[in-house]
Amino acid sequence: MKADAKQITHLLKPLRLLLLGAPGSGKGTQTSRLLKQIPQLSSISSGDILRQEIKSESTLGREATTYIAQGKLLPDDLITRLITFRLSALGWLKPSAMWLLDGFPRTTAQASALDELLKQHDASLNLVVELDVPESTILERIENRYVHVPSGRVYNLQYNPPKVPGLDDITGEPLTKRLDDTAEVFKKRLEEYKKTNEPLKDYYKKSGIFGTVSGETSDIIFPKLLNLITSKFG
């Protein structure tokens, strides 16, 4: 992975960004790079939150496990309650807040519910970007992907391997495979994603805040993503 350019320490207005993309398209990787590049930006990942809940075997975690293991998306009410509660708990429901959402909303119903909440606090989304990656590239990625669940750090045995095989670089704790990181589950998740993503894209296109960046690797996509952000907010 190439080193990123100089940090962006100031934007002309607060950025509230939603990243869209198929499972395995690299949303987590792009999020990590954006957080390093734009220090004042914070992030919230529905996937990371859910995996933490599953690991802790909370009521929400047990309920979510049934859907995730089958490659199904979570019901709107379940994920919406979780995310909106977390946004409030983090103090991000204010006009000056800068944040990035990964993995939520996934349906127009979720998007509408989120918009209503954010409008009440004058903190609406102002940029939605889809990561467009070939399906064959994504399948190869997930077959080689391992994660450190507590932190959400993601490794790939081909292009981003851990320093010590099977262990997290920072903590030395074991890495694991996600329940949904199999070819069979991926294909189910991809079909589910396609069904909901087109209406979601149309929803955000109408608001004039939607954009797309395409590429096969993180190093190709990230400069395009950064240029899109700086052209609108820099």
UniProtKB/Swiss-Prot annotation:
Depending on the yeast strain, the GTP:AMP phosphotransferase is encoded by ADK2 with or without a single base pair deletion/insertion near the 3' end of the open reading frame, resulting in a long or a short form. The ADK2 long form (this entry) is also referred to as AKY3, while the short form has been named PAK3. A sequence of the short form can be found in strain S288c (AC P26364). The modified C-terminus in the long form contributes to protein folding and is critical for protein stability. Residues 45-74 are annotated as: NMP. Involved in maintaining the homeostasis of cellular nucleotides by catalyzing the interconversion of nucleoside phosphates. Has GTP:AMP phosphotransferase and ITP:AMP phosphotransferase activities. Does not accept ATP as phosphate donor. The keyword GTP-binding applies. Residues 144-181 are annotated as: LID. The keyword Magnesium does not apply. It is an enzyme of class 2 (transferase). InterPro entries: Adenyl_kin_sub (IPR006259), Adenylat/UMP-CMP_kin (IPR000850), Adenylat_kinase_CS (IPR033690), Adenylate_kinase_lid-dom (IPR007862), ADK_active_lid_dom_sf (IPR036193), AK3/Ak4_mitochondrial (IPR028586), P-loop_NTPase (IPR027417). GO terms for molecular function: adenylate kinase activity; ATP binding; GTP binding; nucleoside triphosphate adenylate kinase activity. It is found in: Mitochondrion matrix. This is GTP:AMP phosphotransferase, mitochondrial. Its main location: mitochondrion. The lineage of its organism: Eukaryota, Fungi, Dikarya, Ascomycota, Saccharomycotina.
